[in-house]
Amino acid sequence: MGGNVLPIHYDPKTVKQLTKEITVASCIGAAQGALFSIASALLLRRFSSVYRNVRTQVRVFYHCSWISMGAVFRADKQLLKFQTNYYREEQKRREKIMDEAAERGLFLEDESLNSSRSTT
């Protein structure tokens, strides 16, 4: 079968852009999670006798949990934004191709608009 044909979203440029956006979003989310964990830990230390008496490992786990949760949530949100923008651009590209074909008097079906990349 056609093992050398890849969908358009496997384009190295698209993957590189997505990787960059997710990395930046993860770092921002991790920083936000760290700020929240530090602020909440200070409040817990002040007002909670249970938190004051837990071991260091539990406190480290608490901070790591908030940092990783912030990174994951922010990265997921950025992925959804990227996906929305990607599909919007793809729809614009398809509409442009259809308009150009209509001006030339050509008939195109939707299947012919799907961009595929050949790896050869």
Swiss-Prot record:
One GO cellular component term: membrane
Recorded topology in the membrane: Single-pass membrane protein
Residue ranges of the TM segments: 22-44
Major place of residence: membrane
Keywords noted in UniProt: Glycoprotein, Membrane, Transmembrane, Transmembrane helix
Protein name, per record: Uncharacterized protein YBR255C-A
Entry's localization field: Membrane
Glycosylation sites: N114
Source domain of life: Eukaryota
